[in-house]
């Protein structure tokens, strides 16, 4: 049995599945996936994700704003608004949130503030936070520690052992993507061990 803890069902290219999400989900079920958590990247995703989750008992979703979204969208993600969006039973997590300095360093302050608000919402509704971090490992760990966040996952982890240990010590999980299989990813494979 497998659980896909990080899929983007609203972004999936359905061409190989005759344009039908149900076909894609059934193929995954046939391969042993028993639950799917579709991850939100902006404040409008929850509408489509709620509709998908209502049709599929094995699909839940998250609510949140990806750190590469524009500052105006990040500003709309207040703690209270995230708490409001997180009320449905099928909302299993808060996020995708975090810090991404790889794509842009123009809005670091906004990313940090938005990340902290997601953590506050996560704590208020007692649901885990889904964290994206890229080229921002120190600030990510610092915010998790400062906010005393103890329930979450760093997805698509590509950082070093020290970062993994720091978030594991906070009660977080880390997940690895297919990147771990790349020939030049021996350091990442060592972290996964």
Where in the sequence are the language-model features?
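Mid-domain alpha/beta scaffold segments of enzyme catalytic cores
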Residues: 1-193
